[in-house]
């Protein structure tokens, strides 16, 4: 066992003395040492309850004959960080999370790790750490929040955080009063858990099942459900089996597992952020996977779910309909069914054991919402290295669009223009210098897209950015445009009035300019000056790579 580095031999007497100070005894030194990577914090609703999950994990570890050691890492709430300087730190926190786990695991010689994430950057940050360390590891998330209930005119509707973001646009347009907004604000987030729709956090928690790194139910069992506690206990027991068999993350997260994750992703209509994160996980796992391959997956995999923000259902409905296992059951003809999982079963065996889909929340594969999946990677002279769109959340009339560019060099300027009624039907908003380097930190443009949707413009206006979008975004929103403006990508050459062509059906994103004109304009673009020149974001700006490669650090 790796933990023998700190507990065996006379030269380790000082180490054992320190361990005894923690309450361990001689018998404890014969057992595997397991790190429990918690991301509990009182700041994030999705993480406020993770101490309870951790205690259940410890029960499972103890029952199976291990010794658990809990330690923490950071977690950012993207909703609270949204639309101010804090959002510059959200994506960069992913690398910090991976690094802190690496430091703790290597410094203390754990034999295995149980990861307890929940929200957006925590899941991929921990997956990256698991692959980097490559010691037996397993995940159990905190679970999704229940949808809120809003009573209006004797009718009760289900609402969530995205309802509040979009309501701000309705207030700005005079379609909702501030008093009505306050009532919505009070009920939209009723308790602990990751925000209730198929937003980024829940996308990543569901994909963790498809990657093979979590037990069935991880993606959908609600945070407040007693089954979540039982799942945590089972996870604690299972890590001992993984240690015994020396099953490590790189045995599980293979190119086939990445393929399965994207197959599930496009079937669910998951967040565009999943592309960024799964590519980063693949990088750490040494599992090569290209953006073009995502299109091939999406071209042949049906879209089976319309979950918020793309449709009316929440994660609790997905759970009631059979959960991720039932989606995988419908997807079995498209999966790499021999891919391994931490359960000891293959992904195909997990699918076989799941209940049949309900053909409502989870459509039968023979009756999909669309024969093509929910994500698309667009290429063209505006995005030579690619851009990402959630096509399952795009109105049919916006799948092909031609319109004049309206250029904004920051999210704040674009938001001001939208709130001021300066954007008209047909426009293509371009928000640039918001990429990994340019932001820095590749902020999410949820406020602009929510305002457009709340004002009813999401079926008439497109938005293009080298930044990111929230998983709660809907509409014709193309993000991750690469190369970014700060790297002198073509998006930096755009001027107001340039005609932009969007063809999601054919994966095209282009501007009606010749290559010569683009290069001529780029030659006159001033050299990019980093916006932040001190602290962690200075280091991040200097070391982060393109969104097309997952915005990982330089090797």
Swiss-Prot record:
InterPro entries on file: Dihydro-acid_dehy_C (IPR042096), DihydroxyA_deHydtase (IPR004404), DiOHA_6PGluconate_deHydtase_CS (IPR020558), ILV_EDD_C (IPR056740), ILV_EDD_N (IPR000581), IlvD/EDD_N (IPR037237)
Signal peptide limits: none
PANTHER family: D-XYLONATE DEHYDRATASE, D-XYLONATE DEHYDRATASE YAGF-RELATED
Keyword Amino-acid biosynthesis tagged: yes
UniProt cofactor note: Binds 1 [2Fe-2S] cluster per subunit. This cluster acts as a Lewis acid cofactor.
Native organism: Dehalococcoides mccartyi (strain ATCC BAA-2266 / KCTC 15142 / 195) (Dehalococcoides ethenogenes (strain 195))
Active site: 470 (proton acceptor)
GO cellular component, one term: cytosol
Reaction equations catalysed: (2R)-2,3-dihydroxy-3-methylbutanoate = 3-methyl-2-oxobutanoate + H2O; (2R,3R)-2,3-dihydroxy-3-methylpentanoate = (S)-3-methyl-2-oxopentanoate + H2O
Binding site for Mg(2+): 78, 120-121, 444
Task performed by this protein: Functions in the biosynthesis of branched-chain amino acids. Catalyzes the dehydration of (2R,3R)-2,3-dihydroxy-3-methylpentanoate (2,3-dihydroxy-3-methylvalerate) into 2-oxo-3-methylpentanoate (2-oxo-3-methylvalerate) and of (2R)-2,3-dihydroxy-3-methylbutanoate (2,3-dihydroxyisovalerate) into 2-oxo-3-methylbutanoate (2-oxoisovalerate), the penultimate precursor to L-isoleucine and L-valine, respectively.
One Gene Ontology term from the biological process aspect of the record: isoleucine biosynthetic process
Quaternary assembly: Homodimer.
Pathway the protein acts in: Amino-acid biosynthesis; L-isoleucine biosynthesis; L-isoleucine from 2-oxobutanoate: step 3/4; Amino-acid biosynthesis; L-valine biosynthesis; L-valine from pyruvate: step 3/4
E.C. number: 4.2.1.9
N6-carboxylysine PTM positions: 121
Family annotation (Gene3D superfamilies): IlvD/EDD C-terminal domain-like (3.50.30.80)
Sequence positions that bind [2Fe-2S] cluster: 119, 195
Molecular function per GO: 2 iron, 2 sulfur cluster binding; dihydroxy-acid dehydratase activity; magnesium ion binding
Source organism, top-level taxon: Bacteria
Cofactor(s) needed: [2Fe-2S] cluster; Mg(2+)
Family: Belongs to the IlvD/Edd family.
Swiss-Prot/TrEMBL keywords: 2Fe-2S, Amino-acid biosynthesis, Branched-chain amino acid biosynthesis, Iron, Iron-sulfur, Lyase, Magnesium, Metal-binding
Protein name as annotated: Dihydroxy-acid dehydratase
Encoding gene per record: ilvD
